[in-house]
């Protein structure tokens, strides 16, 4: 080695140590920010999941797949929801606007020969929008609520209530 010239390896080493330290610190920072703890089941839901649409403290999922009514109920349960009911004219208009084309199962069923309609939770349907048809299971058509045989395949709409 020649006299008076700085050593190249020590200069590189002094540059690598700070750069390496910065990379390690940034990596740890990214890992900390990107990992989230699981949400405990007793925590309230404050926002809609990806693929769901929010309206009036509810989240709605509009399916593209078709199932019979009982499978539609199960699919909603698998997503921690239930088939939607209709609670107001405004909700009815919102759902019609977002559901797209086709018929969609909702959570209203006829429970007796007198034409009494009940929601999935067992409460009475308030006939906010009259249900037309002769079937036992209600669905949304393009403009109204209709009824048909429960075994027929249709799209479906799930709802999760934000707490």
UniProtKB/Swiss-Prot annotation:
UniProt xrefs under SUPFAM superfamilies? C-type lectin-like
Q: Which GO terms describe its molecular function?
A: carbohydrate binding
Q: Which residues form the C-type lectin domain?
A: 48-159
Q: Which CDD domains match?
A: CLECT_NK_receptors_like
Disulfide bridge map:
76-158, 137-150
Q: Which residues cross the membrane?
A: none
One protein family per Pfam: Lectin_C
Q: Which UniProt keywords apply?
A: Disulfide bond, Lectin
| Protein name per Swiss-Prot or TrEMBL | Putative C-type lectin protein FPV239
């Amino acid at each position: 080695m020649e006299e008076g010239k700085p050593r190249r390896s020590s200069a590189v080493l002094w540059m690598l140590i700070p750069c390496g330290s910065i990379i390690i610190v940034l990596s740890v920072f990214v890992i900390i920010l990107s990992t989230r703890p699981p949400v405990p089941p007793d925590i309230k839901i404050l926002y809609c999941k990806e693929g769901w649409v929010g309206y009036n403290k509810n989240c709605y999922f509009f399916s593209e797949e078709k199932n019979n009514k009982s499978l539609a109920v199960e699919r909603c349960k698998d997503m921690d929801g239930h088939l939607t009911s209709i609670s107001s004219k405004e909700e009815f208009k919102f759902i019609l606007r977002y559901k797209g084309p086709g018929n969609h199962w909702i959570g209203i069923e006829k429970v007796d020969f007198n034409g009494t309609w009940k929601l999935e939770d067992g409460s009475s349907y308030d006939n906010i929008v009259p249900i037309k048809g002769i079937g036992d299971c209600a669905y949304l058509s393009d403009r109204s609520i209709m009824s048909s045989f429960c075994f027929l395949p249709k799209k479906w709409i799930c709802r999760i209530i934000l707490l």
